[in-house]
């Protein structure tokens, strides 16, 4: 697999993970700028872009996350282009989340207290020509510096890259998930239970335009769309379902 691991000099968590990967002999492409403000012109062609990153939240809850970058609305204040999402590899995202959870569950890391979850599509970059993912340590400056957190991410990345490179994983149906909160608890649970390979995720509060709906179904391979039935507004469900049925896109409620 032709992949590119990417760090930012402006991101302490990114630098933390980078050091651990380099200790195992992995090359990490380093940016002078923030990762979310990068563009395809900053990188050579690759079949997968993986950004090593910090995660910040007001709760400061220790969290390890995975998500694909993209702007679901015209707001591009955090990088990328308005109403544009990156390509997504649901197998990579799901295996990476599962491997993070595997290492995080080991007895030696229990006292760290990290939660593991997906996040929905958000922020840049958005113009890359291949699947992209952010893997993040959160949610405060204290966690960004924790070596064991970087070691969890590093081991999970190595296992995931090897599994995909050698085809050493179980085939599952690939899905797109609509609805729920920012940390997508329902779809995180489905991924960790190994029920599906989970790709694009969008939150309840996003009002998805036809432009975004078209990108969701063309920039990721999938078997069907899943709708968090209690995690979307009724009006939005109606609009999305009409779109999927118009184009004969299979969907299911969960």
UniProtKB/Swiss-Prot annotation:
Sequence intervals crossing the membrane: none
Subunit annotation: Monomer.
UniProt xrefs under Pfam families: tRNA_deacylase
Gene Ontology MF: a single term: zinc ion binding
Single GO BP term: D-amino acid catabolic process
Cofactor comment text: Binds 2 Zn(2+) ions per subunit.
Protein name: D-aminoacyl-tRNA deacylase
Catalytic activity: a D-aminoacyl-tRNA + H2O = a tRNA + a D-alpha-amino acid + H(+); glycyl-tRNA(Ala) + H2O = tRNA(Ala) + glycine + H(+)
UniProt source species: Methanococcus vannielii (strain ATCC 35089 / DSM 1224 / JCM 13029 / OCM 148 / SB)
Role of this protein: D-aminoacyl-tRNA deacylase with broad substrate specificity. By recycling D-aminoacyl-tRNA to D-amino acids and free tRNA molecules, this enzyme counteracts the toxicity associated with the formation of D-aminoacyl-tRNA entities in vivo.
Lineage: Archaea, Methanobacteriati, Methanobacteriota, Methanomada group, Methanococci
Protein family according to the UniProt entry: Belongs to the DtdA deacylase family.
């Amino acid at each position: 697999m032709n992949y590119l691991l990417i760090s930012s000099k402006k991101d302490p968590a990114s630098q933390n993970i980078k050091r651990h990967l380099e200790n195992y002999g992995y090359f990490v492409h380093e940016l002078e700028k923030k990762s979310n403000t990068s563009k395809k012109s900053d990188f050579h062609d690759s079949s997968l872009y993986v950004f090593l990153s910090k995660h910040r939240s007001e709760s400061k809850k220790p969290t390890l996350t995975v998500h694909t970058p993209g702007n679901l609305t015209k707001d591009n204040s955090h990088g990328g282009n308005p109403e544009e999402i990156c390509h997504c590899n649901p197998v990579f995202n799901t295996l990476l989340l599962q491997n993070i959870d595997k290492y995080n569950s080991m007895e030696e890391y229990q006292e760290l207290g990290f939660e593991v979850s997906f996040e929905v599509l958000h922020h840049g970059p958005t113009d890359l020509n291949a699947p992209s993912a952010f893997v993040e340590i959160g949610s405060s400056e204290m966690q960004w510096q924790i070596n064991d957190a970087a070691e969890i991410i590093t081991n999970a990345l190595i296992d995931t890259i090897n599994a995909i490179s050698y085809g050493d994983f179980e085939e599952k149906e690939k899905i797109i998930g609509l609805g729920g909160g920012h940390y997508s608890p329902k779809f995180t649970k489905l991924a960790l239970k190994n029920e599906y390979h989970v790709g694009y995720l969008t939150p309840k509060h996003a009002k998805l335009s036809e432009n975004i709906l078209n990108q969701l179904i063309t920039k990721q391979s999938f078997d069907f769309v899943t709708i968090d039935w209690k995690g979307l507004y009724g009006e939005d469900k109606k609009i999305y379902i009409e779109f999927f049925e118009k184009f004969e896109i299979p969907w299911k409620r969960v």
